[in-house]
């Protein structure tokens, strides 16, 4: 690629999926520019690495570009896309550029509706602990390197495989993981769940004949597709007796998990005593997937165990800000999480209750997309009703037009009818901080969830406490 393409421009470079690819390309020696309407930590980091960042979308931004990379969030009427097509500059989907990176290394692609970011991060951490120095591109910021991506010198590249627009079909890894298959982004699949499952089969079949698919058989839909797959398979699970890699003796220890991992493939059966520096049974499953990958690649057991015990976490994946003092006296625990699907919310709430037993759970949630709210309305009502206190902000549209009866007021009404809790509707996200300070009690656990603008709320709430720590420290 490099002998023909030297300058690559990213439209929407501040997005987590875009910024990681851009960073790897910078470190490979490419000239990178990009546009994004807003400055964020990703754009600032890329600028420090040498990227040219524009905070407008304009045709002149791509004047010297040899290729233009876009995500599905970028529409065809974007002035940079129009200019690129007029000048016959290749306009490349983000996943296609990611596929080019996979061609440079042995690719490991992590797919599934939930758990991709954490599992990708765990796999990268295990390989790093084993001295493999992997390249990785992750949807969240891995705290140990404070970045979404890193160019390593080793033979492996670990990436997230995005099913939301079926673009993971561009990828051709040598090893893949499928964590689960759930109803989300269904408009991509014409609201046909069988089509979604078949697309996952097609993705797995992109593996070479010597490749390996690591599949979670606790998920019924993943189990259903195994008979359709012709590539080698390793299975993992907690609840499935036939899983080749499984966990028993699972114990919660506040924000850590302890379990025995039983490995029944690649050599004589053996058991690892694992401490996972993450909370929740869903993260035990993510860890089992990472163990399966490490086992397949011949990573020593000691490196696997150490990587899981010392895992530094990912931004906005059960990110803890500690105890935040209340104005008068007392404090509340503050947790921030990117989860925005009912299954993710349920798993994160369960993890919070096990990590902080007996404490009141206050959930502040911002629904993401009107279409998702409509398609999963009853599931949202059921799951959100499980909080002790619910703060519900208006839907983050993510470019969508409003849909009748798929807004947060409608959700609040439906939850109220259940009679379990009285949701507090917050029309403007800017009002969330004041509302939390109004209702918070000593000992509360405040869990902030959502994939939209609510992501700024936890740092804002924690800022006074962080400043106080700096002053007194």
From Swiss-Prot:
ATP binds at residues 112-118. One of its GO terms (cellular component) is cytoplasm. Its EC number is 6.3.2.8. Pathway: Cell wall biogenesis; peptidoglycan biosynthesis. Gene3D superfamilies: Mur ligase, C-terminal domain, Mur-like, catalytic domain, NAD(P)-binding Rossmann-like Domain. GO terms for molecular function: ATP binding; UDP-N-acetylmuramate-L-alanine ligase activity. The keyword Disulfide bond does not apply. GO terms for biological process: cell division; cell wall organization; peptidoglycan biosynthetic process; regulation of cell shape. It is found in: Cytoplasm. It catalyses: UDP-N-acetyl-alpha-D-muramate + L-alanine + ATP = UDP-N-acetyl-alpha-D-muramoyl-L-alanine + ADP + phosphate + H(+). Keywords: ATP-binding, Cell cycle, Cell division, Cell shape, Cell wall biogenesis/degradation, Cytoplasm, Ligase, Nucleotide-binding, Peptidoglycan synthesis. InterPro entries: Mur-like_cat_sf, Mur_ligase_C, Mur_ligase_C_dom_sf, Mur_ligase_cen, Mur_ligase_N, MurCDEF_pg_biosynth, UDP-N-AcMur_Ala_ligase_MurC. Belongs to the MurCDEF family. Cell wall formation. NCBIfam families: murC. This is UDP-N-acetylmuramate--L-alanine ligase. The gene is murC.
